[in-house]
């Protein structure tokens, strides 16, 4: 049963679909076959054998069928994703945003900095699963993060202000990507152990801790700009810099907003 208001439906991006090399090859073959069919038809008017035309027609139908199979395959591989107030539906499964663990592989190629290749997520108490981003527009990730943040930000702020700590495991993207990008469903479950033993960023109402290095809000500037987390002293000397484009951070958008929120909250005495 579907609950709450439907906010957005993300569908397959067919422009990405038709940019796939094998689809381009198929299109070229279809184009060549059309030319062949046209040429043979013209030659038929001059008295050529009917079998040539029949062969061309059969090839044309075969290419059309192959094109249909490709479309069917990609439609099933990249199903619609429905976003509601409290959850999203992917492959008929309802996944709640609250306490959802996730991270994503960034596409660091030139001109692709706003792209992502995969989202790996684990519902509260569930198993790790993945969404292949190659068949969707970047809008999918924007909606995903916005919905997640709306459901978890206020709760995280309240926890920190009450004396609690929000913890964000992080790891080198290359390590995680090489190990899990093509993993089976069973292999993905190792991610839980990987992140339990990974370095962690901890946010409290007094400070941010980067793998046991503590920086309090009052004496340091802590910024999370696009692609980089920077810690600097009050004289603007950089103390620590983490390039997030090469790092996977669990619940990265939540970490970014918490850092922005608490860094502004505390006055700096230069």
Name every feature range the model reports, one short phrase each.
Residues 1-33, 38-47, 101-173:
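N-terminal membrane-targeting/pre-transmembrane regions
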Residues 13-79, 186-193:
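Alpha-helical transmembrane spans
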Residues 78-93:
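Membrane-interface amphipathic/juxtamembrane segments adjacent to transmembrane helices
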Residues 127-128, 132-214, 237-239, 260:
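N-terminal recruitment modules of adaptor/scaffold proteins
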Residues 97-103, 133-139, 218-222, 243-249:
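A short, sequence-level motif marking secondary-structure junctions
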Residues 79-83, 198-203, 221-223:
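Short, exposed beta-strand/loop patches in secreted or surface proteins that constitute
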Residues 230-270:
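Eukaryotic low-complexity, acidic/Ser/Thr/Pro-rich regulatory regions of large signaling scaffolds
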Residues 88, 94-110, 208-229:
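Phosphoinositide-dependent membrane-docking surfaces
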